[in-house]
Amino acid sequence: MDEQSTLRVGDRYQYAGFWSRVGAAVIDTVIICVLTYPILVAVYGWAYFDSDAVIQGGTDFVLSWLFPLIAVLSFWVYRQATPGKMAIRAKIVDANTGDKPSLRQYLIRYLGYIVATLPLGLGILWVAWDKRKQGWHDKLANTVVIGDKERTAEVAFSSNSDT
């Protein structure tokens, strides 16, 4: 990051940490499962979950591979975050400028999840040790995930919500 972006990001934002990102991923996974599993069970029956096949048919390909790709990329392009990241008030930004990433960066980031998960998830776990909290998918796409420093600032328990 250049000095100006570092100051801007450092003043208001912090890198989203490992556990908050795990929470965001759980939220996203639950949403995808709630939307796709009923259809998969209706089409393939409960035996779908017992199969060793990576793809069991056209419906499986669309719901298990294509739908998540389109949904995630759409949220990233239009909101810079999936519902899980929005829940933790985090967003994806270009690691150099702090601006919205390009579509190319988003595609690299999405495909980078494959690289990050193959060696026993080490590329995902990397977020826990990296000083900028980047997983391998972030490093490949040159992105970082940032969140508001004061995540509870909008929560108010009295009539005075300015404090």
What is the predicted role of each segment?
Residues M1-G121, K139-N142, I146-T163:
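Short, small/hydrophobic-residue-rich motifs at membrane-helix boundaries and re-entrant hairpins
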Residues P119-R132:
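Glycine-rich flap/beta-hairpin and adjacent strands of clan AA aspartyl proteases
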